[in-house]
Amino acid sequence: MNPFYSTFPDSFLSISDHRSPVSDSSECSPKLASSCPKKRAGRKKFRETRHPIYRGVRQRNSGKWVCEVREPNKKSRIWLGTFPTVEMAARAHDVAALALRGRSACLNFADSAWRLRIPETTCPKEIQKAASEAAMAFQNETTTEGSKTAAEAEEAAGEGVREGERRAEEQNGGVFYMDDEALLGMPNFFENMAEGMLLPPPEVGWNHNDFDGVGDVSLWSFDE
């Protein structure tokens, strides 16, 4: 079973006095839309807006999905609303289908037969309300699952960073090491400095041959 459909708020999807006419998943297997392929639309000049699998839903140009169901033995339809995702619209359809057709309903999701709260009457307003609640419960469930997955991924990434730091500290004997050469952007800086200290110092004296004077200069004269 898809995990997105596994759990819904107890206030709405509890098995209570308002349980689905298909009372228990073990009593019978509901007829699913996935096992009943749709016929191709007769119109050829228009874009197909129906979903290829889900019943009762159509896509608008805006990308959103609308849902409506035909009332049994009537030409009229019950409008269930516009939804941001096809799954929400498909879930709304299941509520209305169960309310109007009971066990003979063709469902989009197998668990709709026993998880959804079905209105006690076939009043269009009651069906619309129940369908809206089912769609919102589905949205809340998928949002919760998405947030949980993101939080788990973030926690796993943080744990990976901490594990890497711990292993690096163990390899260094618990002593923090800073690579000054990498920090200064001067590789082999200290090695070159050590080699320079082994060289003899440069000559700082001077040679009298380097003097450009015209003759010897006597500082003292004893002839006088």
UniProtKB/Swiss-Prot annotation:
Keyword entries, A-Z: Abscisic acid signaling pathway, Activator, DNA-binding, Nucleus, Stress response, Transcription, Transcription regulation
Residue interval(s) of motif Nuclear localization signal: 38-50
GO biological process, one term: abscisic acid-activated signaling pathway
Induction trigger: By high-salt stress, drought stress and abscisic acid (ABA) treatment.
Ranges of compositional bias, category Basic and acidic residues: 160-170
Task performed by this protein: Transcriptional activator that binds specifically to the DNA sequence 5'-[AG]CCGAC-3'. Binding to the C-repeat/DRE element mediates abscisic acid- and dehydration-inducible transcription. CBF/DREB1 factors play a key role in freezing tolerance and cold acclimation.
Name by which UniProt lists this protein: Dehydration-responsive element-binding protein 1D
Organism: Arabidopsis thaliana
Lineage start: Eukaryota, Viridiplantae, Streptophyta, Embryophyta, Tracheophyta
